[in-house]
């Protein structure tokens, strides 16, 4: 009994297996290209594993060629179906986000913004110019007020000087001077010439000293009064004369007052009295 040989494979089955292999290779190349061009995007899911009878392997193809088409049925005639990758989830990067504006619309917006900026700048410049003019007028007004103030100050100083001239205030008198009481002429006797001349004069006779005693008593009292008046005058003037000037002043006033003194009737004047002279023992001339 001879073994039966399997019929030759149908040419349509060979072409379908070759097409399936080409399709799988094309899918792998497409996936590799997408991975290189868009590394950030998620990888597409790999195709589901094919059943062993659909894998394009050489021994399987030979086995399939040896299978009777009546036994395999219409499954082999239909050919393998490869699942198509779902590309709906992948979005183009160009369409992501907002819609890009057109060039003409963007240029119009830029022109409008520049126009608004120029208007604001011109308004601000006009405002600053107005403020500068106001400051200039204010500075001129301040200068005029300062000049007027200086003129008024000079006028006030002149008025004060004239007021002081017209008032003529007199300084107050010291407390120890009273000008309300009348002051009469007080006779002042002449002072003695010197100590040497008085010591050399001898004692007059007993009758002569009794006559000039009233005159000497009268001369001592005016001398005290004159000294007190001189002290009052010096205190009122606020100054004191030197001792030499004061002695000369007292001597002159004493001589003038002595001339005015008139002795009683029947009594000789003090200037008319003559005293006997005696020569000194030392032999020097006397100085009167």
Curated annotation (Swiss-Prot):
Biased composition (Low complexity): 26-41, 106-116, 213-222
Region of interest (Basic motif), residue spans: 101-124
Claim: Flavoprotein is one of the keywords in the record: no
Biased composition (Pro residues): 1-10, 42-54, 202-212
Pfam families according to UniProt: bZIP_1
Chain ranges passing through the membrane: none
Positions of the UniProt region annotated as Leucine-zipper: 128-159
Compositionally skewed regions (Polar residues) per UniProt: 84-93
Cysteine-cysteine disulfides: none
Highest taxon of the lineage: Eukaryota
Compartment(s) of residence: Nucleus
InterPro entries: AP-1-like, bZIP, bZIP_sf
Keyword line: DNA-binding, Nucleus, Transcription, Transcription regulation
Membrane recorded as keyword: no
An example Gene Ontology molecular-function term: transcription cis-regulatory region binding
bZIP domain residues: 100-163
Main localization (coarse): nucleus
A single cellular component GO annotation: RNA polymerase II transcription regulator complex
Region of interest (Disordered), residue spans: 1-121, 172-226, 242-288
Annotated family: Belongs to the bZIP family.
Function noted in UniProt: Putative transcription factor.
Protein name: Putative transcription factor kapC
């Amino acid at each position: 009994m001879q073994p039966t040989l399997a019929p030759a494979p149908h040419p349509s089955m060979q072409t379908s297996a070759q097409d399936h292999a080409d399709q799988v290779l094309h899918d792998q190349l497409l996936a590799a290209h997408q991975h290189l061009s868009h590394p950030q995007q998620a990888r597409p899911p790999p195709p589901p594993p094919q059943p062993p009878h659909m894998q394009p392997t050489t021994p399987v193809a030979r086995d399939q060629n040896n299978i009777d088409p009546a036994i395999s049925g219409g499954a082999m005639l239909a050919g393998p179906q490869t699942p198509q990758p779902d590309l709906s989830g992948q979005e183009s990067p160009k369409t992501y986000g907002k819609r890009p504006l057109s060039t003409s619309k963007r240029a119009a917006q830029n022109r409008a913004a520049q126009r608004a900026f120029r208007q604001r700048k011109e308004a601000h410049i006009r405002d600053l110019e107005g403020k500068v003019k106001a400051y200039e007028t204010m500075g001129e007004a301040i200068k005029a007020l300062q000049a007027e103030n200086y003129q008024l100050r000079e006028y006030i100083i002149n008025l004060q000087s004239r007021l002081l001239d017209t008032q003529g205030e007199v300084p107050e008198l010291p407390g120890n001077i009273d000008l309300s009481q009348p002051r009469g002429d007080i006779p002042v006797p002449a002072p003695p010439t010197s100590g040497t001349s008085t010591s050399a004069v001898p004692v007059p006779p007993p009758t002569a000293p009794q006559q000039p005693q009233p005159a000497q008593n009268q001369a001592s009292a005016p001398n005290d009064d004159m000294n007190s008046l001189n002290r009052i005058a010096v205190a009122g003037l606020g100054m004191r004369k030197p001792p030499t000037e004061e002695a000369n002043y007292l001597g002159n006033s004493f001589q003038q007052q002595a001339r005015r003194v008139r002795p009683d009737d029947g009594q000789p004047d003090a200037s008319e009295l003559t005293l006997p002279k005696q020569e000194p023992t030392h032999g020097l001339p006397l100085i009167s």
